[in-house]
């Protein structure tokens, strides 16, 4: 029944990449440390996770890992809730390898999220309260999808059929938000699929959503629609402007609510 599941104790944040498409902004610092309304992206993410009851967060680092580790130490100290694992292959592989680096953490229910997705607690609550399925893919809709969107096709019951950037326009029902929840046998299925994918050279340059696509073909992935304007993905400089507007508004809204 929706809302009856406890939040998973674990979350994995994929923050190994540099973020080349942001140009000089990420020449010397990783994308996840870029400030939004005066607060680094990764801090927004972790604070939202902790506030929702998730008490173990693993951050996969790569580019300028020492800067991420320093920030996490300064902000969260040694309370045991936050840990990092280093992906030494970050510059020559894609995020499927970062998932493989963190596979030991995937021993029970966990959230997997991209290190460039900002989101509100309301989004997490919606996903965590969704009906239990092996894999829950958070999705959103918009009038027009661009070439960089990770597009999603659904069946009539909300099961994911396909996840791909190259879906034809007539097959697109939503886009992936970049946050996936694994429950029941989902963690084992995903971990086994990682091991299998990396037996082949093409797995080194693959996205983890290619595994979600494979699991979807077995009707194991259900979509969860998230609230509108509750998230933002940071890929290009224009996204930073959008994120600043969205999250400065949210901060103001929360401040006004607290004062009432």
Regions found by a protein language model. Name each.
Residues 120-198:
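Conserved core of the sugar-phosphate nucleotidyltransferase
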Residues 2-11, 173-260:
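Conserved alpha/beta core of the MobA/IspD/sugar-nucleotide pyrophosphorylase nucleotidyltransferase superfamily
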Residues 28-43:
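Short catalytic helix/loop segments, enriched in acidic residues and glycine
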Residues 79-154:
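Conserved beta-loop-beta/alpha segment of the NTase-like Rossmann-fold superfamily
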Residues 2-13, 39-109, 200:
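Conserved N-terminal catalytic core of the sugar/cofactor nucleotidyltransferase
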Residues 21, 67-70, 101, 122, ...:
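Phosphate- and divalent-cation-binding pockets in alpha/beta enzyme and binding domains
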Residues 1-24, 33:
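N-proximal low-complexity "stem/linker" segments adjacent to membrane-targeting elements
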Residues 32, 81-83, 159, 220-222:
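Conserved beta-strand segments of alpha/beta enzyme cores
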């Amino acid at each position: 029944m929706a809302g009856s599941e406890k939040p998973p104790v674990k979350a994995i944040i994929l923050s190994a990449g540099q973020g080349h498409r942001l140009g000089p902004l990420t020449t010397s610092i990783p994308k996840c440390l870029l400030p939004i309304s005066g607060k680094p992206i990764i801090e927004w993410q972790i604070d939202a996770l902790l506030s929702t009851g998730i008490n173990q967060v693993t951050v996969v680092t790569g580019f300028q890992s020492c800067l991420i580790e320093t920030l996490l130490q300064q902000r969260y100290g040694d309370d045991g809730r936050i840990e990092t694992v280093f992906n030494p292959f970050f510059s020559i592989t894609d995020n499927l390898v970062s998932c493989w680096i963190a596979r030991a953490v995937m021993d029970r229910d966990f959230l997997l999220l991209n290190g460039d997705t900002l989101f509100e607690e309301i989004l997490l609550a919606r996903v965590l309260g969704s009906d239990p399925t092996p894999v829950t893919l958070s999705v959103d809709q918009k009038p027009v999808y661009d070439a960089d969107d990770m597009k999603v096709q659904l069946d009539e019951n909300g099961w994911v059929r396909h996840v791909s950037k190259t879906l034809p326009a007539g097959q697109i029902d939503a886009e992936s938000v970049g946050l996936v929840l694994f429950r029941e046998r989902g963690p084992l299925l995903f971990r086994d699929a990682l091991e299998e994918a990396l037996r082949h050279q093409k797995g080194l340059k693959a996205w983890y959503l290619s595994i979600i696509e494979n699991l979807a073909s077995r009707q194991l992935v259900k979509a969860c629609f998230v609230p509108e304007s509750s998230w933002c993905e940071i890929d290009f400089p224009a996204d930073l402007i959008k994120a600043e507007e969205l999250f400065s508004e949210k901060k103001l809204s929360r401040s006004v609510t607290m004062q009432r």
